[in-house]
């Protein structure tokens, strides 16, 4: 596929989703079943409006069914399913057009996801695409009966171990995904969709008190230092503001945000997307907290010249300004979080560093920590 986007001064090649692969294979298999002749290529237009012509491989034809595969191409995106073959077997049925999952396709075991409990983890858009394309082939050949498409990915069980599927309650394989049909490298929308899916799952389970953490540092601190488990934890990456918004939309009661100073210090200046591409402001925020805590311009200047927040913490520690500066920072973080969340959801934060442990907590953080500890 030769379509590109430009991000961070890089030219990145687009790819296509497992959903597009399944839809293309379903169309090809239906056409071969009804027409009786093998095809080498299949054409379709993705929901994003991009036309594709994809090679059809691993064809197995019989009177009752046809199986074929389309190879997933994720472009320049890192994707565990890149290079996987998505197989579809199409067979005739009395009436209607059906889709299901076979080998390597997960099954939904928890409510709140795109598909109901018990269904194959094939999302709505790929299902719709498969049905529409099979109907199109039936019309082309004047076929008035029904067709059923079963999707399989032989390596799906192994691939699923490198995804969030098990945590989301999708067991036994991967999901067939895609809303636009196109994989966009470094897609923020895809990450936010994953966060939304986790929140939706917890909402459907009636779990209204969650821990959120930007990444692996936070998860490690939770388990090793705070003795909290990860069962009710959502990894929000850099999208703290959007996670808060979505949690409010799902009617969550509380969020406990736990993260490294290097990320959460930005909240002290109201920066709710903590990716360095969006904004920095780490040292400026800490320097202003030093001034608010009674420090002088020389100390603030030393903070501004630090390369990392760990370096800044070291300076504050040796000058006995760590605690007062962190108190000022936590006041600002508390204000920013509560302003974003509004009055309907409680939100608290814990900030830590790898060397010095907990650096600060918002006023109600300890209460939420105890709430989560009681579930251990």
Question: Which residues does each PLM region occupy?
Answer:
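Generic N-terminal targeting/processing segments that precede catalytic cores or assembly contacts
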Residues: 1-162, 166-168
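A structural signal for small-residue-enriched, beta-sheet-centric alpha/beta enzyme cores
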Residues: 3-6, 13, 168-174, 179-198, ...
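Surface-exposed flexible segments
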Residues: 83-87, 225-228, 362-368
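Generic domain-boundary/flexible-linker signal
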Residues: 110, 160, 221, 266-268, ...
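Short, amphipathic C-terminal "tail helix"
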Residues: 346-376
């Amino acid at each position: 596929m030769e379509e590109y986007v430009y991000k961070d001064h890089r030219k990145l090649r687009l790819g296509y989703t497992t959903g597009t692969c399944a839809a293309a294979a379903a169309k090809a298999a239906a056409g071969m079943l009804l027409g009786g002749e093998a095809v080498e290529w299949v054409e379709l237009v993705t929901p994003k409006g991009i036309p594709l012509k994809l090679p059809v491989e691993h064809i197995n034809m019989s009177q009752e069914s046809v199986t074929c595969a389309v190879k997933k191409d994720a472009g320049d995106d890192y994707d565990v399913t890149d290079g996987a073959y998505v197989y579809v077997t199409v067979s005739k049925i009395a009436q209607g057009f059906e889709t299901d999952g076979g080998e390597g396709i997960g099954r939904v075991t928890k409510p709140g996801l795109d598909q109901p409990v018990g269904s194959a983890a094939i999302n709505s858009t790929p299902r719709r695409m498969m049905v529409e394309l099979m109907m199109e082939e039936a019309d082309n050949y004047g076929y008035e009966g029904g067709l059923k498409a079963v999707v399989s990915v032989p390596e799906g069980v192994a691939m699923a171990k490198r995804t969030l599927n098990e945590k989301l309650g999708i067991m036994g394989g991967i999901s067939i995904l895609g809303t636009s049909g196109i994989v966009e490298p470094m897609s923020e929308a895809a990450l936010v969709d994953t966060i939304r899916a986790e929140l939706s799952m917890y909402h459907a389970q009636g779990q209204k008190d969650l821990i959120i953490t930007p990444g692996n540092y936070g998860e490690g601190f939770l388990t090793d230092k705070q003795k909290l488990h990860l069962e009710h934890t959502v990894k929000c990456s850099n999208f703290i503001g959007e996670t808060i918004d979505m949690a409010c939309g799902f009617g969550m009661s509380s969020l406990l945000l736990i993260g490294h100073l290097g990320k959460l210090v930005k909240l002290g200046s109201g920066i709710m997307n903590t990716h360095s591409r969006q904004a920095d402001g780490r040292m400026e925020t800490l320097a202003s907290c030093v001034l608010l805590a009674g420090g002088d311009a020389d100390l603030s200047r030393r903070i501004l010249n630090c390369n990392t927040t760990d370096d800044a913490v070291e300076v504050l520690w040796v000058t006995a300004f760590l605690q007062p500066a962190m108190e000022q920072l936590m006041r600002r973080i508390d204000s920013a979080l509560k302003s974003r969340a509004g009055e309907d959801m409680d939100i608290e934060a814990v900030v830590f560093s790898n060397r010095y442990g907990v650096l600060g907590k918002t006023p109600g953080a300890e209460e939420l920590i105890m709430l989560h500890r009681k579930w251990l």
